[in-house]
Amino acid sequence: MNDSSVIYRAIVTSKFRTEKMLNFYNSIGSGPDKNTIFITFGRSEPWSSNENEVGFAPPYPTDSVLGVTDMWTHMMGTVKVLPSMLDAVIPRRDWGDTRYPDPYTFRINDIVVCNSAPYNATESGAGWLVYRCLDVPDTGMCSIASLTDKDECLKLGGKWTPSARSMTPPEGRGDAEGTIEPGDGYVWEYLFEIPPDVSINRCTNEYIVVPWPEELKEDPTRWGYEDNLTWQQDDFGLIYRVKANTIRFKAYLDSVYFPEAALPGNKGFRQISIITNPLEAKAHPNDPNVKAEKDYYDPEDLMRHSGEMIYMENRPPIIMAMDQTEEINILFTF
């Protein structure tokens, strides 16, 4: 009997997760071959008499028939998520932002934003400039405690944290090889530019937007991508280069469409869910199925339990006013 074994190591690459995200995005839209997504809100009844106290936590939603039934029973309205309200996002980290730890120390493959504040301004009149760290100084420490050499650390799968700080923010769009070397031991790669209107309307303190391939193809100059170096034509897969795998859903709950939920003295709402491909309510059971494609629906205008509920959330109350529009953002990581 042969007791020897073969040791191998394998991974599923980041492109698998990015591809799943892109396929999901491309499946959303109007028409028989596309999926529709709706964000629902509901439950005006308080969780308990002390739900407004500090530290109160609502019950966990349950992924069961009873849990889905509870969401439908307490539903107050639904809002369609348009494809334009879906963004690929990655975590935001600004060079030199002292609100966060180690604002001048970076690791290989860190993605960093510049030109977003006076302390990292490099190009007047441009939007936010996004870079990737390609190399760091040799002095530092490895996540594998027994290793002290940077190259050996990286070859064995460790993470190298340099002890030297980045002295100046990366600047420019790169040389013929696309790299930027400020002279402090750090080497950077220019990725893309976030236009001013996008940084204001679609980016947050936590996340920056990465353009979808068709958005980038439509106007490369807008995203600072007109001089992108690539081995193939029409290569606009920036989401693969930055390993994006998180998609943000955005919807607006407008009191104009749901006035009953915003009347004076209303008790707010406490549940949110996401439903794919719900059907409109039928006048007769034998009527043909009609996929819901309007922008807004009241619960009675949808067929109860139709579609698939892919997200459930119980939360503290949100109280709406008559002139209020509530913005809801939900992140899915693939």
Curated annotation (Swiss-Prot):
- Give the function comment from the record: Intermediate baseplate protein. Involved in the tail assembly.
- Say yes or no: keyword Disulfide bond present: yes
One annotated GO biological process:
viral tail assembly
Q: Which cysteines are joined by disulfide bonds?
A: 142-153
Gene Ontology CC terms:
virus tail, baseplate
Give the main localization category.
virion
The record, for InterPro entries, names: Gp8_sf, Phage_T4_Gp8
Instruction: Give the family from UniProt.
Output: Belongs to the tevenvirinae baseplate structural protein gp8 family.
What Pfam families does the record point to? Phage-Gp8
Q: Which residues form a coiled coil?
A: none
The stated induction of this gene product is: Expressed in the late phase of the viral replicative cycle.
The places in or outside the cell where this protein is found are: Virion
Subunit structure, briefly? Homodimer. Interacts with gp7. Part of the baseplate macromolecular complex which consists of gp5, gp5.4, gp27 (central spike complex); gp6, gp25, gp53 (inner baseplate); gp7, gp8 (intermediate baseplate); gp9, gp10, gp11, gp12 (peripheral); gp48 and gp54 (proximal region of the tail tube).
Name of the protein in its database record? Baseplate wedge protein gp8
- Give the highest taxon in the source lineage: Viruses
Task: Keywords in alphabetical order, please.
Answer: Disulfide bond, Viral baseplate protein, Viral release from host cell, Viral tail assembly, Viral tail protein, Virion
